[in-house]
Amino acid sequence: MKKITSLLIIALLLLSSCGSVPITGRKQILLVSDQEVLTSSLTQYSEYMKSAPVSSNASGKNMVTRVGKKIAAATEQYLKANGLSAELSNFSWEFNLVKDNQVNAFCMPGGKIVVYEGLLKLCSSDDELAVVVGHEVAHAVAKHSNERISQQLLTQYGA
């Protein structure tokens, strides 16, 4: 009986947590509120930026900011035109270039984007960088961080 009760609770939790990704409509499970994810990610982002060496490459920083602002504006325009403006209500875009030779970038929930200098060695134009930044922005808009946390919680509790 205890096992059946546990399964019913898990089933109800899963059903109540089902959602859809804006734009694509792909189904996802979000067990943690957007606000909880945002609060946690802003803390992590702040700690990361305190310890990360910010790049002194002025032209690289300008490129990251310029491209990031264009991607953010296009994202906002698209979501607004499709009645999805609320999806960005917790976003405050920020674009940073850090001194690191990794060929990588990441975007935290809320629109906090970090590009590593190593990536700029491969991106010779705004268009090339826009592909990467657009990809990172898509992760944030689709709430992939929340989805990943939810999947980890399910795994942790054996669902």
Q: What do the predicted segments below correspond to?
A:
Residues I4-S6, L13, C18-A159:
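A Zn2+-metalloprotease active-site environment signal
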